[in-house]
Amino acid sequence: MPQVTDHGGGVWSLRVPIPDNPLGHTLVHVLDTDRGPVLVDTGWDDPASWAELVGGLDALGIAMTDVHGVVITHHHPDHHGLSGRVREESGAWIAMHAADTAVVRRTREARPGTWLDYLARKLAAVGAPEDHLVPLRAARDSGRMDTLPGLRSALPDREIVPGELLDLAGRRLRAIWTPGHTPGHVCLHLEEEHPSRLPGHGRLFSGDHLLPGISPHIGLYEDPDEVTEADPLGDYLDSLERIGRLGVAEVLPAHQYAFPDAAGRVRELLDHHEERLTGLLGLLATPLTPWRLAERMEWNRPWEQIPYGSRNIAVSEAEAHVRRLVKLGRAEAVPGTDPMEYVAV
């Protein structure tokens, strides 16, 4: 039975499952417009996910062929995965921020092993042990990369321009650029009175930027063709403060559940990351590579119990925090170390 929530005012959410993922599901939002329904995100490209998406729309009396457009908060496969199939069935347009569209385009054009080569180089540079790198090389040589999600994601045909209203007949939906989780992540501010007249300025489709009970992953290793040294954590914290100033009545995130008090949740996340950075400075009293730092950080389980793929995510997050400390002048690289070590200033 599809799980559908009516948020009022012509807005619904559908729970679309993510296979083999502790997040469980993506909340795909449906926005009624004068030209037909528009989806905010689409879910993972998987038969069961597609069936739930179609079933959820059916429960609302909407055929997939009725979908007018798709607005993507960011390029990750649990958000953008089914966009191409939606477009094939309905002829809907797909809109995304240019920075994430560029990642999608480069990923589609690259040979399948490019991303694994890049990841292996990055992990070696931060001190990953050889036995961790061997499976990456084996996967590349086996050709299994051809089946990984995101390699053939649909190319968007519209650009989301920060600060501008999207062209949605009868609705006021404004794009807010919130880089950090991805370079082109956007939140979407529905500038309309809350249907229950909750105090505040409209509602916010927050994607993965602002979640009620999870701190979104802020890491590196997103784009093999990156040409600048990004500071995703710095970008994320700046973006959080902008969202906190909106004063929205309710947040409609892409995971978990809707919630009020965006400003309070923003404060919690800002405090969390400041505590995290302060804790890392204590660990960096002794020079460490980002890998060794990740081994010593607090996660939701001991390092030895963290699955292989999650370790890659963890060390990318550790390096993102180190990069923020370096940019703040609170840590520095140790000259002559290879792999590079960092120490608190």
Please annotate each region the language model reported.
Residues 278-345:
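C-terminal regulatory/interaction regions
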Residues 24, 48-51, 57-167, 194, ...:
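Active-site HxH/HxHxD metal-binding segment of metal-dependent hydrolases
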Residues 88, 178, 326:
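Short, contiguous alpha-helical
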Residues 2-60, 109, 187-212:
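Conserved beta-strand hairpin/beta-sheet module of binuclear metal-dependent hydrolase folds
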Residues 73-79, 97, 181, 185, ...:
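Histidine-centered divalent metal-coordination motifs
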Residues 37-38, 44-46, 148-149, 154-155, ...:
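Metallo-beta-lactamase
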Residues 8-16, 140-149, 169-173:
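Short Pro/Gly-enriched beta-strand edge/turn motifs at strand-loop
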